Amino acid sequence: MYKLIHSIAERSHATAVKRGQDVSTFGCIAALRTEQQEYWQAVDKGAEVADIRVLSAEANKLPDAEFTALYEAKIHNTASDELADILITAATWLHTAETGGGEDFDPDRSIDVMLLSGAVQFVCNRITGNADVERVQLVTNMKLRFNELREG
């Protein structure tokens, strides 16, 4: 999971900055609070995507405007979407910590990494098998594209 968030950290951070979001430690903590609440709301409503493989294959072939419309209609605000938001926020926070830590940044000695690992663990606790791993990866990749394409 850490490999995943590290691989998307710079991209997540750049997108958040472009969208005017607060990427500071406190901004990321506040965002995680919101995303966790939205996750539980989606779970309580039973909001989920039935076959993410099929939808992902279809969505990734679409031009940007059509992709955004499909994501908004079929994936946005589902439990998987909110888990992706949690991972993306953790990745954004990781990039903030890395850049703030300078050349000698050591994640093992970073309070930011220690704290953001709770968000990663929250997502990991929702994964019960390979299908969940694949779902998180597919939705996270689509969510990154969706975030890059939308305003604010």
PLM regions and their residue ranges:
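Flexible "arm" and connector segments at domain edges
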Residues: M1-G152
